[in-house]
Swiss-Prot record:
Signal sequence bounds: none
List of residues binding Mg(2+): D51, D91, D227
EC category: transferase
Assembly mode: Homodimer.
Annotated protein name in UniProt: Selenide, water dikinase
Family note: Belongs to the selenophosphate synthase 1 family. Class I subfamily.
């Protein structure tokens, strides 16, 4: 192994959840696969576009299983590991569960990265697992062309507290717990154009565990959960709408954004994944006539380790937002509503 230490982002053709296959491509691939639902205990399988698989063990216990991995979104190896681990664990929280262990997924170009750099990536991931109170109990590694890191995560949940993305009810309020703009920031990082202070803001958001999801799922007034990741707030909101057979309305002025996301998006720091996302689902999104393209693409911006999108009883929304903010998610707010109608998203000013 040599001692070269190039920028991690220079070794990857894409980074973070922006590496995900476009929604339309993924749908086409899954359409040719048999649905994994002939098992009575499999409460959530691969036919639901949900965040994780859920298997009911008995009357009191469900096992939640998920995996998530990607290429670098930042150049600091420890931060890359931390972000990837936070993102992977999030799927368990988004289903209403609590993680119990993780397995590392590691692919590294060993002729390009030295052992110290790779070790820092693993240390970063392990530090987040420790924060979540779980061990990295094993894993698998390969020599790969691009750096890849992530986790397979197992969690537990009571059957009554499983929260799917398809449980939204007409009249529900929609809450978002983190700011949008991680993809925009990552595009600026690639071009060495991220303003001062924004890197710390981005790391603070992407390494903040979504552990509030398990607390929210214990509340019967919370009807559905999902995390906002590579398909953007529009894409994951649309998954909610389709799974619930309802129409969602998002108010643009209420959506929280990272502090410089608007400025950077207007300057053209847009990822290719934003365009692919929009091409996949734009036909089911109704936008204001005067919305500029950069704002449209910002709503399709791929989030890495994004926040939770929560559907809850409208009369409880204010109290839930306050609870979420006090738990350490200061940008949380009510961003929209659900109503009877065709499965689509309408964006209003």
């Amino acid at each position: 192994m040599n001692t070269l230490a190039p920028r991690l982002t220079d070794l990857a053709h894409g980074g973070g959840c922006g590496c995900k296959l476009a929604p339309s491509v993924l749908q086409q691939l899954l359409a040719n696969q048999p649905a994994a639902r002939p098992f009575a205990q499999l409460l959530v399988g691969n036919d639901m576009a949900d965040d994780a698989a859920v298997w009911q063990v008995d009357d009191n216990t469900c096992v939640i299983a998920t995996t998530d991995f990607f290429m670098p979104i930042v150049d600091d190896p420890r931060d890359f590991g931390r972000i990837a681990a936070t993102n992977a664990i999030s799927d368990v929280y988004a289903m209403g569960g609590k993680p119990i262990l993780a397995l590392a997924i590691v692919g590294m170009p060993i002729n390009k990265l030295d052992s110290t750099t790779i070790a820092k990536i693993l240390e970063g991931g392990a530090s987040i697992c420790a924060e979540a109170g779980i061990p990295v109990a094993g894993g698998h590694s390969i020599d790969s062309v691009e750096p890849i890191y992530g986790l397979a995560v197992i969690g537990l949940c009571h059957p009554s507290e499983v929260r799917r993305n398809g449980g939204v009810k007409a009249g529900d309020a929609l809450i978002l717990t983190k700011g949008i703009g991680v993809g925009i920031y990552s595009a600026a990082i690639k071009k060495n154009a991220l303003p001062p202070g924004c890197y710390e803001e981005m790391i603070g958001s992407t390494t903040l565990l979504n552990r509030i999801g398990a607390d929210l799922a214990a509340d019967p007034d919370v009807h559905a959960l999902t995390d906002v990741t590579g398909f953007g707030v529009l894409g994951h909101g649309l998954e909610m709408a389709r799974a619930s057979q309802l129409s969602l309305t998002l108010r643009l002025s209420a959506i929280p954004f990272l502090s410089q996301a608007y400025m950077l998006a207007e300057q053209g720091f847009i990822t290719g994944a934003s365009g692919r996302n929009w091409a996949s689902y734009g036909a089911d999104v109704v936008l204001p006539d005067d919305l500029p393209d950069w704002q449209r693409l910002l709503l399709a911006d791929p989030q890495t380790s994004g926040g939770l999108l929560v559907a809850c009883a409208p009369e409880k929304a204010g109290a839930l937002v306050e609870k979420v903010r006090l738990a350490g998610y200061p940008l949380a707010g009510i961003v929209g509503t659900a109503a009877a109608g065709a499965a689509q998203i309408k964006v209003i000013s």
